[in-house]
Swiss-Prot record:
Keywords: Carbohydrate metabolism, Cytoplasm, Hydrolase, Magnesium, Metal-binding. It catalyses: beta-D-fructose 1,6-bisphosphate + H2O = beta-D-fructose 6-phosphate + phosphate. The gene is fbp. Belongs to the FBPase class 1 family. GO terms for cellular component: cytosol. It comes from the Bacteria. One of its GO terms (molecular function) is fructose 1,6-bisphosphate 1-phosphatase activity. This is Fructose-1,6-bisphosphatase class 1. PANTHER family: FRUCTOSE-1,6-BISPHOSPHATASE-RELATED, SEDOHEPTULOSE-1,7-BISPHOSPHATASE, CHLOROPLASTIC. One of its GO terms (biological process) is fructose 1,6-bisphosphate metabolic process. Substrate binds at residues 116-119, 209, 242, 272. Its cofactor is Mg(2+). The lineage of its organism: Bacteria, Pseudomonadati, Pseudomonadota, Gammaproteobacteria, Pasteurellales. Homotetramer. Its EC number is 3.1.3.11.
Length: 335
């Protein structure tokens, strides 16, 4: 069975200009995933990483202890490798420039949600790490600038996630398909388990927090009712499955077919998910697996960011299901 390291080396020839940098970055992410996997599996045995840290992040959300642990681990691992010029995280207000000689001469920046769904940790529910890699646009040899991070998702060179569930799995793309690697704790190695992953064109699962139904736009309400109606021709009604962890919900739908929706709402007029840390990397993966990612009207990967922590509505998953949801959004578009 091929390991992640072997797979990365085999594919390195696809990026002759990377000079091994992408290999180093992915190796850093692999290391962080193994450390987070270890600590999550011990979470019930120690109070050091469970619960609220007492700090709010830049969005005003409570940071869990494991949020900060994962954030610091990711930053330290990337700094140690010196393969990236800068780092931006959902957990930190500003980007971080790695202002060493190697850092200034590095070609890439990375954006990450170090621990998606961290509120689930205390109740032993799946969580994940999301990452997105871009080639910098500022001159090599100088410190990175905000513009290096403010690129549309269609300029990503790699993206992926790690899901920490019944097993730990790393899924990533470099723009040539999606591949998944399952962690074997006995070997300490990620092994290729899901090659060339493809999301089914349609499915029977819709994932949305229906407790917020009254706050949703009319197009989403109509689509939910469509999912619940009986119709043998379209294999409805669909099944509602919502974990509350983007990575876990998307991963299930990637394997089985389905749609994940986190729309704008009266309490989140711009949506809740972050474009750069969640929307873009998940959208890149979805498209590379044959799916679609939309803000309800337009392709997520074409959005030009205007803020580092910009929010975005997200409709992502099986092609036919996302297209149907978009039809409802256009039909019942609100001013």
């Amino acid at each position: 069975m091929k390991t992640l390291d072997e797979f990365i080396v085999d594919r390195q020839a696809e990026y002759p200009n990377a000079k091994g940098a992408l290999t180093g970055i992915l190796s850093s992410i692999r290391l962080v995933a193994k450390v987070i996997h270890r600590d999550i599996n011990r979470a019930g045995l120690t109070n050091n990483i469970l619960g609220f840290s007492g700090i709010d992040n830049v969005q005003g959300e409570h940071q869990m202890k494991l949020d900060l642990f994962a954030h610091n681990m990711m930053k330290q691992a990337l700094m140690a490798r010196e393969e990236v010029a800068g780092f931006a995280s959902e957990e930190e207000e500003n980007f971080v420039a790695f202002d060493t000689e190697r850092g200034r001469n590095a070609r890439y920046v990375i954006l990450t949600d170090p621990l998606d769904g961290s509120s689930n940790i205390d109740v032993n529910v799946s969580v994940g790490t999301i990452f997105s890699i871009y080639r910098r646009v500022s001159p090599i040899g100088s410190p990175v600038t905000l513009e290096d991070f403010m690129q549309p998702g269609n300029r990503q060179v790699a993206a992926g996630y790690v899901v920490y569930g019944s097993s730990t799995m790393l899924v990533y793309t470099t723009g040539n398909g999606v591949n998944g690697f399952t962690y074997d704790p006995s070997l300490g190695t990620f092994c290729l388990s899901h090659e060339n992953m493809q999301i089914p064109a349609t499915g029977k699962i819709y994932s949305i927090n229906e407790g917020q139904y009254l706050k949703f736009p009319m197009g989403v309400k109509k689509y939910i009712k469509y999912c619940q109606e009986e119709d043998a021709a379209t294999n409805r009604p669909y099944t509602s499955r919502y974990i509350g962890s983007l990575v876990a919900d998307f991963h299930r739908n990637l394997l089985k077919g389905g749609i994940y929706i986190y729309p704008h709402a009266t309490n989140y007029p711009q949506g809740k998910l972050r474009l750069l840390y969640e929307g873009n990397p998940i959208a890149f993966l979805a498209e590379q697996a044959g799916g679609i990612a939309s803000d309800g009207y337009n392709r997520v990967l074409d959005i030009q960011p205007s803020q580092l922590h910009q929010r975005v509505p997200l409709f992502v998953g099986s092609k036919q299901m996302v297209e149907k949801a978009q039809d409802f959004m256009h039909q019942f578009k609100e001013d």
